[in-house]
Amino acid sequence: MAFRALTTKAAARPLLALGPRSVAMGARYMSTPAPQDPKSKAAAILDSLPGSTALSKTGILATSAAAAIYAISNELYVLNAETILLCTFTGFSFLIAKLVAPAYKEYADKRMQHVSGILNSSRNKHVAAVKERIESVSELKNVTETTKVLFEVSKETLELEAKAFELKQKVDLATEAKAVLDSWVRYEASVRQLQQKQIAESVIGKVQAELANPKFQDKVLQQSVADVEKLFASLK
C-alpha cells in the first residue's frame, strides 16, 4: 500500500510540475482583452448553476470547491494535463453555450415565426377558399327550381320555334304558289297576246287580200257610187 502511494506520488510529480505551466497557458488562452465586471461575472456564474435561490447555488458552488480541494489535497484526484484539457474544453463549451445559444435561439425563434406565419397564411387562405366554395355551393341550393323554370322556358321556346318553322313553311309555300300562278298568268297573257296578234294579222291579211281582188274593188266601187247617188237623190 505504501509502495503504491510512493509510486503514485512519484508519477504525479512531473504532472504537478507541468500543471502550473498548462494552467498558465490555458489561462492565457482563455483571457479576454476587455475587462469584465466581477459582479456581473459572479452573477453569470451563479445563473449557470442549478438551483432556485442564490443560497442554494452558493452552497452548490462551495460544496463543489470543497470537494475538489479535498480530493486534490488527499491525492484522491491527481491534477494532470487531461484535467487541464478537460477544464479548458469545459470553459470553451460554456462560453460557446453562453454566446452562441442566444443567437441560435433568436435565429430558431425567427425561423419558427416565419414558418408559423407561412402555415397560418396557408391555413387562412385554405379556410377562405373553403368558405368561398361553401358560399358558391349554397347559392346553388335552388338549382332544382331553376332547372324546372329553364326546362319550361326551353319547352316554350321549342314550341314557338316549331310554330315559327310551320309558319315559315306556309309562307314559303304561298310564295312558291304565287310565283307559279304569276308565271302561269304571264304565260296566258303572252299566249293571248300571241293569239290576238295572229288573229289581227290573219284579218289584216284577209282584208288586204280582198282589197287586192279586182272583183271586190269593183263591188266596193259600185257600192260607193250607189251610196253617192242615194245621197244626191235624198238632197233633191
Swiss-Prot record:
Keyword line: CF(0), Hydrogen ion transport, Ion transport, Membrane, Mitochondrion, Mitochondrion inner membrane, Transit peptide, Transport
GO molecular function, one term: proton-transporting ATP synthase activity, rotational mechanism
Entries under Gene3D superfamilies matching the protein: 1.20.5.2210
Transmembrane segments: none
Record's signal peptide: none
Keyword Nucleotide-binding on entry: no
InterPro entries in UniProt: ATP_synth_Bsub_B/MI25, ATP_synth_F0_suB
Example of a GO cellular component annotation carried by this entry: mitochondrial inner membrane
BP-aspect Gene Ontology terms: protein-containing complex assembly; proton motive force-driven ATP synthesis
Domain of life: Eukaryota
Organelle targeting sequence: 1-29
Protein localization: Mitochondrion; Mitochondrion inner membrane
Subunit structure: F-type ATPases have 2 components, CF(1) - the catalytic core - and CF(0) - the membrane proton channel. In yeast, the dimeric form of ATP synthase consists of 17 polypeptides: alpha, beta, gamma, delta, epsilon, 4 (B), 5 (OSCP), 6 (A), 8, 9 (C), d, E (Tim11), f, g, h, i/j and k.
Chain's role: Mitochondrial membrane ATP synthase (F(1)F(0) ATP synthase or Complex V) produces ATP from ADP in the presence of a proton gradient across the membrane which is generated by electron transport complexes of the respiratory chain. F-type ATPases consist of two structural domains, F(1) - containing the extramembraneous catalytic core, and F(0) - containing the membrane proton channel, linked together by a central stalk and a peripheral stalk. During catalysis, ATP synthesis in the catalytic domain of F(1) is coupled via a rotary mechanism of the central stalk subunits to proton translocation.
Family recorded in the similarity comment: Belongs to the eukaryotic ATPase subunit B family.
Protein's recorded name: ATP synthase subunit 4, mitochondrial
Record gene name: ATP4
